[in-house]
Amino acid sequence: MLPARRVRSLIAAASTVVIAGTGSAVDVAAQGNTSPVNDRPNPYQTVEGWAKLPDGRAWGSTSAVAIAPDGRGIWVAERCGVNNCLGSNLPSVYLFDANGTATRAFGAGLILSPHGIDVDREGNVWVTDCACTLRGAQAPGDKGHQVFKFAPDGKLLMTLGKAGGARDSSGLWQPNDVLIAPNGEIYVSEGHSSSENAIARIRKFSKDGKLIATWGQWGKGPDDLDQPHALAMDSQGRLFVGDRGNDRIKIFDQSGKLLQTWYQFSRPSGIFIDRQDRIYVADSESGSVAPTRKDWKRGIRIGSAKDGTVTAFIPDPAENPPSTSSAEGVAVDAAGNIYGAEVSPRALKKYVRK
């Protein structure tokens, strides 16, 4: 069974916003921000310590989790025991079986800040290196700001972007996430900074890596992006982008026309859409870690990608963490188990039905 596809973003003109899962739509510019849905039941229980790294090694930060084509294997990109792989020779990409045992590992010495991940229909693994978690350290000019395509055995098949990055069309800058559409086209969301005039855009490539188009610019308006952090695609081929800095999900068609804007899923760090068009949205930055959103709740919101209804919510068990908490990346296997990749807690959590 093939895994569900995930998607990306784009930019366009006027649109609609769905209010708090009601399904009603109004003009985005007139509406402005809307508080997320916080009061849905939690039908899941948490499995701590499920996945074990080789040799008893401690987990580093992770925001990247995806499902293998068999619906059972779990691919994770992990930051070498800390929050980046600068100077490390540890592998950063792992495949776990259904029991949480690492069965494959690769990527050592190649990736500085593994951030986003996708697995295509052939089982190839795509990982972004945003070079955005170095905490003041100087990134070497021969690494960073790239997207890597690996065969399932770890062989490097393709590289998008040039080492060291570029803010213009000659390269990528802080690629947050990558999505491979069913037709093989590649979408990359760029820009991890929320500062004014930062890079915030979507790149579209052909299946062989040729740049087709670029959309987006930084801003706070209805047609802008601010830190496009996550990508996913539904069964209709609509592109979902987690416009995290603007606390919303933007939905586009594949030509870049803006269709809807949703606020009810909170501040989206990660998005996953399964084959039944259930949507899973991870918020790792609200509540106590966000002064302007103290009344919002971190966690994973679950609902319908068809109409935006929120039906369930897995809250972050940490009430007052000092920094980002709960899942930043999210994926769901063929059995319906949810996996949350966490940055500050440095963990891969599993959520199963109660």
Task: Please give the residue ranges for each predicted region.
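Bacterial N-terminal signal peptides that target proteins for export
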Residues: 1-14, 22
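Short hydrophobic/aromatic-rich motifs at helix boundaries and adjacent loops
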Residues: 11, 19, 34-35
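Active-site-proximal helix/loop capping residues that flank conserved catalytic or ligand/cofactor
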Residues: 14-17, 48
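C-terminal segment of classical bacterial N-terminal signal peptides
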Residues: 17-27
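Eukaryotic scaffold repeat domains enriched in small/polar residues
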Residues: 26-354
